[in-house]
């Protein structure tokens, strides 16, 4: 397990510029599992790829600026702020799919279309807000395949409800009336929202970086919900994380 928390900015460790040109550069690469970045600012624009290579990675309360091919496709992004200076911040997400929870997207370029991915891959966006300076179309990817299914809930653009990928609506699953939402988002008896990062990141070793397992279990026991997705749906949503309280009782 590796955690990066409030990574300090030490100017004395900086290097003098070789010239005035701007080069793309990765913030960091890693080969490992169970990575957490909390309250870290990642600024590198093109090809940033913060902590790219992690099997499971949580970005919590992080700030990112990016152009294209710049975000980590295996990440769970919770309470993050992302500024898009390019139209396609992801190169790919098909290794497992990226998830955004309660995050803000600021479209900072002048184009009239914003996508998440350059390639075709799964994404989930829950309780997220787009902030735009002019009308912008937001889509999952530039040329989505017919088989692609991405998931959204509670998405807004400048405060108004918004459906991502309206050009091909069959690519988008709106989870407002779906049990699958509990794989990402739960509400306790007091109305408090619990983002199910335990379910998304637990893997085979019960990893729970934000210590929400007990809350997830209590919610499952309180209202008797044991969410099972039928086999036919699971086959079509093979990357979908499942919320199953019975496995943690």
Annotate each predicted stretch with a short phrase.
Residues 1, 239-241:
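Beta-solenoid repeat scaffold
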Residues 1-224:
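Sequence-level preference for short, compositionally simple segments enriched
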Residues 230, 235-239:
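N-terminal amphipathic/hydrophobic targeting modules at extreme N-termini
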